[in-house]
Amino acid sequence: MAAILGDTIMVAKGLVKLTQAAVETHLQHLGIGGELIMAARALQSTAVEQIGMFLGKVQGQDKHEEYFAENFGGPEGEFHFSVPHAAGASTDFSSASAPDQSAPPSLGHAHSEGPAPAYVASGPFREAGFPGQASSPLGRANGRLFANPRDSFSAMGFQRRFFHQDQSPVGGLTAEDIEKARQAKARPENKQHKQTLSEHARERKVPVTRIGRLANFGGLAVGLGFGALAEVAKKSLRSEDPSGKKAVLGSSPFLSEANAERIVRTLCKVRGAALKLGQMLSIQDDAFINPHLAKIFERVRQSADFMPLKQMMKTLNNDLGPNWRDKLEYFEERPFAAASIGQVHLARMKGGREVAMKIQYPGVAQSINSDVNNLMAVLNMSNMLPEGLFPEHLIDVLRRELALECDYQREAACARKFRDLLKGHPFFYVPEIVDELCSPHVLTTELVSGFPLDQAEGLSQEIRNEICYNILVLCLRELFEFHFMQTDPNWSNFFYDPQQHKVALLDFGATREYDRSFTDLYIQIIRAAADRDRETVRAKSIEMKFLTGYEVKVMEDAHLDAILILGEAFASDEPFDFGTQSTTEKIHNLIPVMLRHRLVPPPEETYSLHRKMGGSFLICSKLKARFPCKAMFEEAYSNYCKRQAQQ
């Protein structure tokens, strides 16, 4: 009973103080002050006293206030606002004159619309404070909410509680200043970021056996068939809408909402190579595949189911041994990310170092061939993909690449090499590998902070330009200087940290080397494209075996146009506007012609290379970057020629 009355006292007094603060704020905003403000304060003081007397009498006490004797461990119970004082986030509504020590202190309140921010620990494992703090509506407050511990509401037998209030004055703080502070707080670069699992992700066991995985694809095929029949029936009964647009998702009855849900649900359940292929398609623009199918694969990219605890622990015990947890102080059993091949868990080493543990789904490495075959059969059956988009030789390349991505020991070695190559880089960094917690199916690295680039569209134009500029420079260095490239341009493989103003590079499973015999010719093709030299592009393309020289005119023109479009960005000293140039869309419009008339498959190296280059250009396009590119290529070309001369 005592605890309930104590909480009631605090709430009642707090409401009175909030009312006073609101009244004073509106009076000051309207330019009214003086006697009205003093009267409001007197009224508030009287109300607080009467509430204290009334509730004290209910308890059978004559004293207005006593101490709470509760001890929450001293200063650990302090509240903090997430906005600095200087930004005007904490407002003191006490009078300008010397405070009356007998009157209750005023309540500091964040000047913002709606409730104050909820508690957020400064790190994933930092204590949030005493019990109940995380649900407090007060948010964080720097300084004491009450200037004197004796001013806290209390009654005999209650526990002592400490609150804190910022006593800094707000003299001269205008509504404009407060609005600027509010806008500064809202900017993406000023927020703390922590990666979390998609709200669509569910805990579902990964089907391990090939028969179990085949059953899921078989169920998907049957479901798509029935869904398509239902959609055809709907179309026959439904006319076009008044605007003249089609009443269904697209021309294919297989692309209904119900079928989209079936595809997403199946791929997120089986994961592995099938989900990886869907994620690869998700980073293409709408000119490459049906825009409705692109939306399906975008949902696939953003959400994957995660393993049940028992299945995940079995993988860890098999790979790291039964005592792997002895090396950790903490292990978060629910993952904070789930992808196509594995899921990522937060952990803390004995020394306090926070790490990310990527755990591979069981059975995905052994089922690559069957998964790819099953998914392609389903997609081809439903006519969802452009004809000839995945010829047999490309499928073979994808199988080999996916097998390499399942080798976490190889990925760890690639990450170490990239970390050495970019050591001391002012903008990029590669998280360190934690060798003692790595195995063929477990990869552990230091934890990085930030957010993926698909969430960077709200950043300033200057920051977006800098991010994209550095990504393109890195692409050129990877190919022409390192001869070693991370070829997966997935948004989530680039994490921007606004506090450090750096980009962390993640996921090196798709890394591959490029021989100098390949890059010697390829850089000459880009050189000719930047110079708009169509004949040299043709000659070098034949030398590289892109063309045989016997292609029909329409095929040759499509190939040359695609190369020249790629070189447009490097052709001019003027800023190149990626947001309006539609480089990837122009190239993708030529793909159907090349698929139909190509006589020989392109060099195997170009599949991953063009995926990386096209994905990097697409990042620049999505972020609407605008900067000159000619100088970066000229520098890369000059340095390459110097290294050639020295060999």
Curated annotation (Swiss-Prot):
Sequence motif AAAS motif, residues: 337-340
Q: GO MF annotations for this entry?
A: ADP binding; ATP binding; enzyme activator activity; kinase activity; protein kinase activity
Q: Per the database entry, which stretches of residues form a coiled coil? A: none
Pfam families in the cross-refs: ABC1
- Tell me which InterPro entries the record gives: ABC1_dom (IPR004147), ADCK3_dom (IPR034646), Atypical_kinase_ADCK (IPR051409), Kinase-like_dom_sf (IPR011009)
Biased composition of type Low complexity is found at 94-106
**Highest rank taxon of the organism:** Eukaryota
Give tissue specificity per the record: Widely expressed, with highest levels in adrenal gland, heart, pancreas, nasal mucosa, stomach, uterus and skeletal muscle.
Say if the entry is tagged with keyword Oxidoreductase.
no
Location within or outside the cell: Mitochondrion membrane
Domain annotation text?
Answer: Adopts an atypical protein kinase-like fold: while it adopts a core fold similar to that of well-characterized protein kinase-like domains, a number of features are positioned to inhibit the kinase activity: (1) an atypical AAAS motif in an alanine-rich (A-rich) loop that replaces the canonical glycine-rich (G-rich) nucleotide-binding loop and limits ATP binding by establishing an unusual selectivity for ADP and (2) an N-terminal domain, containing the KxGQ motif, that completely occludes the typical substrate binding pocket.
Role according to the record: Atypical kinase involved in the biosynthesis of coenzyme Q, also named ubiquinone, an essential lipid-soluble electron transporter for aerobic cellular respiration. Its substrate specificity is still unclear: may act as a protein kinase that mediates phosphorylation of COQ3. According to other reports, acts as a small molecule kinase, possibly a lipid kinase that phosphorylates a prenyl lipid in the ubiquinone biosynthesis pathway, as suggested by its ability to bind coenzyme Q lipid intermediates. However, the small molecule kinase activity was not confirmed by another publication.
Specify the protein name. Answer: Atypical kinase COQ8A, mitochondrial
- Classification of source organism: Eukaryota, Metazoa, Chordata, Craniata, Vertebrata
